[in-house]
């Protein structure tokens, strides 16, 4: 599990740069914000 990628995506989204984040990154961010483990998707 790479939480750093999730956190990086969240930071980018907060700065309005979420449009440049690939879909998998955005999904990872949404899981992170929701408090769910990214593993749940697998």
Curated annotation (Swiss-Prot):
Which GO BP terms, alphabetically?
Answer: lactose biosynthetic process
Q: What function does the entry list?
A: Regulatory subunit of lactose synthase, changes the substrate specificity of galactosyltransferase in the mammary gland making glucose a good acceptor substrate for this enzyme. This enables LS to synthesize lactose, the major carbohydrate component of milk. In other tissues, galactosyltransferase transfers galactose onto the N-acetylglucosamine of the oligosaccharide chains in glycoproteins.
Cellular localisation? Secreted
SS bond partners: none
**Coarse class of the protein's main subcellular location:** secreted
State any GO CC term: extracellular region
How would you summarize the oligomeric state and partners of this protein? Lactose synthase (LS) is a heterodimer of a catalytic component, beta1,4-galactosyltransferase (beta4Gal-T1) and a regulatory component, alpha-lactalbumin (LA).
**What protein family does this chain belong to?**
Belongs to the glycosyl hydrolase 22 family.
Q: Which InterPro entries match?
A: Glyco_hydro_22, Lysozyme-like_dom_sf
- Expressing tissues: Mammary gland specific. Secreted in milk.
Designated name of the protein: Alpha-lactalbumin I
What is the native source organism of this protein? Macropus giganteus (Eastern gray kangaroo)
Q: Which domain of life is it from?
A: Eukaryota
The C-type lysozyme domain extends over: 1-42
Q: Which keywords belong to this entry?
A: Calcium, Lactose biosynthesis, Milk protein, Secreted
Secretion signal span: none
């Amino acid at each position: 599990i790479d939480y750093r990628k999730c956190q990086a995506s969240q930071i980018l989204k907060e700065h309005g740069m979420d449009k440049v984040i690939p879909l998998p990154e955005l999904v990872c961010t949404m899981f992170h914000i929701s408090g769910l483990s990214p593993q749940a998707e697998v």
